[in-house]
UniProtKB/Swiss-Prot annotation:
GO BP: pyrroloquinoline quinone biosynthetic process; sulfur compound metabolic process
E.C. numbers: 1.3.3.11
Protein's name according to its UniProt entry: Pyrroloquinoline-quinone synthase
Pathway(s) served: Cofactor biosynthesis; pyrroloquinoline quinone biosynthesis
Cited InterPro entries: Haem_Oase-like_multi-hlx, PqqC, PqqC-like, Thiaminase-2/PQQC
Top-level taxon: Bacteria
Role noted for this protein: Ring cyclization and eight-electron oxidation of 3a-(2-amino-2-carboxyethyl)-4,5-dioxo-4,5,6,7,8,9-hexahydroquinoline-7,9-dicarboxylic-acid to PQQ.
């Protein structure tokens, strides 16, 4: 039996971009937010839970750096850490997200405590970080390619939220504006790594599965939020109205 023929770089890129059909911009929770149908609680819940993703992105990127022997790749990839953590004496994306939290009426200390993070969101994000630690650096780096679709989702918030949610302080939108440029830059680097590394049919199909894994993570996070904030079925809702779920276990 002959081996399947690898996709050309252009065909492979097209296959990667086609995965955008499953990006979480199409999740009903996101659709409700940018159509102006989300409640204050639903937006606050999204901001609070997404903060857990934000603070873990630098851990994911640090894992990629730790596993990468290529100095030139590390020199460029480290910018992602600085984008989120901030350079010495400068704020980064995490501080910008805390300001978004304040803009929607959340206390920064409550966000930092992560007490509002739903178990389903925590499990999804933790799975992503653990994947980055255990995978080879090329696979972990390529898993970030959901950034191919990120500028569209940031722009949709900037276009629709000020119109639909006048109660949100506009200063909170700084994160989305900043990420528009950063995401486009990151895509160029991540896509170059991916197209160069995956040159066999089997490798390309594996990469498409890895990208789907990342899409599954983002979609599953919103599924958990939908249960809690749209259907009013948070964890243990049938036995208690208290937030009894674990708030994170440090190993």
């Amino acid at each position: 039996m002959s081996e399947a023929t690898a996709l050309s770089p252009a065909e492979f890129e097209q296959a990667l971009r086609a995965k955008g059909a499953y990006y979480h911009i199409y999740h009903p929770y996101h659709v409700a937010m940018y159509e102006g149908r989300a409640t204050r609680e639903q937006i606050q819940g999204w901001v609070a839970n997404r903060f857990y993703y934000q603070v873990n992105i630098p851990l994911k990127d640090a894992a990629i750096l730790a596993n990468c022997p290529d100095r030139e790749i590390r020199r460029e990839w480290i910018q992602r850490l600085l984008d989120h953590d901030g350079a010495p004496g400068e704020d980064g994306g995490i501080e910008a997200w805390l300001r978004l939290g304040q803009a929607v009426g959340l206390d920064p200390d409550q966000l930092r405590s992560q007490e509002l993070v739903l178990p389903g969101v925590r499990f999804a994000v933790d799975a992503y970080v653990n994947f980055a630690r255990r995978a080879n650096w090329q696979e972990a780096a390529s898993s970030s390619l959901t950034e191919l679709f990120a500028p569209q989702i940031h722009q949709s918030r900037l276009d629709s939220w000020p119109q639909h949610y006048p109660w949100i302080d506009p200063a909170g939108y700084e994160y989305f504006r900043t990420r528009l440029g950063q995401a486009r830059r990151d895509v160029e680097h991540g896509l170059a790594i991916t197209l160069q590394h995956y040159t066999t049919y089997e490798g390309q199909q594996r990469m498409l599965e890895i990208l789907q894994f990342k899409l599954d993570i983002l979609w599953s996070m919103l599924d958990a939020m939908s249960m809690a904030y749209e259907l009013n079925r948070p964890p243990y809702h049938s036995v208690t109205d208290q937030k009894v779920w674990h708030k994170g276990i440090t190993l």
